[in-house]
Each structure stands twice: as C-alpha cells, then as structure tokens.
Amino acid sequence: VQGHIGTMYDNGQKVTYNSQNIIDTVEPNNVKKVLVSSLSGLNALGQDTFCSETESAKEIIAMKGNDNVKLLPLLSCQPGIAQDTTVAEKLLDKNKFYGLKFHPSNTNKAIKDNFDIYSKYITLAEKKGLPCVFHSITDGKSDPVEIIKLAEQHPKHPIILYHIDLASQPEQMARTIDNISSSVKAGKSNLFIDISWLTNLWDNAEQNKNTIKQALKKLGADRILFGSDTPITEMGNRDNYGKFADFVEDTVKEFYTDKPKEGEKALNKIFYDNAEELFINKNWFNAKSQPSKSKALLIGVGVGIAAIVAIALKCLHGADKTVENSPSHVSKK
C-alpha cells in the first residue's frame, strides 16, 4: 500500500528517497501499483527538511512510475501547521490525488492538541471522496485512540491506521485492535489497518504473526491492507520486500489452514482488492454521490411521461463499471 519519496530524518540521519528507489524494490516482486506520499511534506516546521504542503505536492506530482509500476500520489497534509484547509483544497482541485496522508509524529502536531483542524481535513476528504491514512503509534502524537476518535466524528469515511500501533508491546497492540474492532462493529467508524512495521520485521516474527492473526480474527480480511513503507530502511531492499510479502502470505494461509479457499480470498483482499476498492474504484464514495432511483424519477415529474421513462431506463440499465486490473490471485515473485 504505502511508499515514500522525499527527505526526512531517520534516527538522526538525513535521508532522501526517489521514485526509482520504490520501483527497484517492488518491480521484481510483481507489484503493479504503489500509493506514495512525500516525506518532505511530513516534517516539523523549523526543520531544515521542512517543505510546505504546496511544495511537497509539487514533489509528489512530479514523480514518475514506469510501464510496469504505477505510482499513485497521496497528499501530505499538515494540520496544526496549517490552520485551515485552504491550501489543501486548492491542491486537490487542481491535481489528481488518491488520498490524504497524515503523520502527526513527524510534523510534531499531536492529534489531541489539534483535533479540530484534523477533523476539518477529514471533512475535506469526505467532500472529495479521498481516504485518509494516518501514521499510527502510541507516542502522544499519533495515538490510535485519537485516530479512532477522529474516525468516529466521520463514521462513514474510510480511515486507515498505518502500522496499527507501531512497535507497541503485544498487550498494547491487542488493545488497539480491540478498540478498532469495537468501533467498527458498533457502526461508529469505517476504520482499516495496514500491517507494515508492526515491530522489527525479523527479530519479532512470532509477535508480528500473532498480530496479523488477531487482526484477522477481530476485523476480518476486509479491513486489512498489506503495506511496506518502501523504500525506508529494510524495505528498500527487494529481497526483504519479497521476504515480508511471503511472511504475510504464509501467516494468512496458516490462519485459514482448514479453509484454504477462504484463505485465498483473504490474500486477494489484503494484497490487492481492499486497496483497489478504497483508493481507486471507490464504490464507497460513488454510491453516496449517485442519486437514488426514486430521486431520479422525482426530477422528471412535470416534464412528461417520455422523460420519466427515459430517466427510469437510465437508472435501471446503467452500464456497470469495469474493474481495471483486478487481480485474481496472489502473485509470487
């Protein structure tokens, strides 16, 4: 799901990534589409790496994929640094973005201290039909409990927690998954999770496996998205990327040991279909924006029988949208 270009500090060291770094990592693993955000637009005000929403948008719009890998831009947003959504709205009006990205930890603008402006950005996303993705970690800034509160202010809008609750202890991770599950099952929110960087990828393999299984049990495959954070650190290596993808696949198959067909469906959802629906097909948004048949008929009242019949036929026999590049199975490298 997620990739990055741009500049940031990682463990005190300034690093810069570009689109070719992503392509070199994912192309050998048969990845066709990557959602990408600008790290430059997710830095704190005052840092030498800080880049405004406008300038970081230029950076992300200018990136290029190739014939095999499409790079789909997310708008890096700065609630708290920006006091309103004016700039973001203009950028969305003029350019094609697939979602809004928030990183309260890196921008140093805690959700709890800037709740109203974060909510305004989500209101803008609702208007534009764009999912919102949050860096999620219990650190006082990007806390999952605060993201859940935001989501419950916008109960129909899809919001994705990257990393679920990054690097948290098993008990804390379980609580976060339970909180997300409770909110969704109560109809209070439309939350999803991404399973990148749950903990250190290799040293805590068993813990990562348990987290994925807990998520499958509590949330189901419909609300889980594969993610990698490519090309940051280990995920800038194509072999490690493939190793992690295989790890996720093996874990899901293990969870569905007695139901292999369900396991295959779950893998399709996690690796492809969920992201395709949320960010590209967007039936969740199109359904809201289309008038109902009854409303369409009411529009024709007073215009004449022929007009009413024409509208009814259009409503009843509208062409179905074709799903582009819908995967039928999990591709192995």
List the model feature ranges, each with a label.
Residues 1, 36-38, 74-76, 101, ...:
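Active-site neighborhood of phospho(di)ester-bond hydrolases with catalytic His/Asp-centered motifs
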Residues 1-33, 218-225, 234-311:
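Mid-to-C-terminal alpha-helical segments outside catalytic/metal-binding sites
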Residues 3-4, 12-15, 20-46, 69-78, ...:
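Divalent metal-dependent hydrolysis catalytic cores, especially in the metallo-beta-lactamase
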Residues 7-17, 41-52, 77-85, 107-114, ...:
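Acidic-and-aromatic substrate-binding clefts and catalytic sites of carbohydrate-active enzymes
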Residues 47-140, 190-192, 197-200:
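Active-site gating/metal-coordination segments in enzymes
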Residues 112-225, 234:
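Catalytic pocket-lining loop regions of alpha/beta-barrel enzymes
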Residues 125, 193, 229, 267, ...:
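Conserved, mostly hydrophobic/aromatic
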Residues 318-333:
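Non-Sec secretion/translocation targeting segments of pathogen effectors
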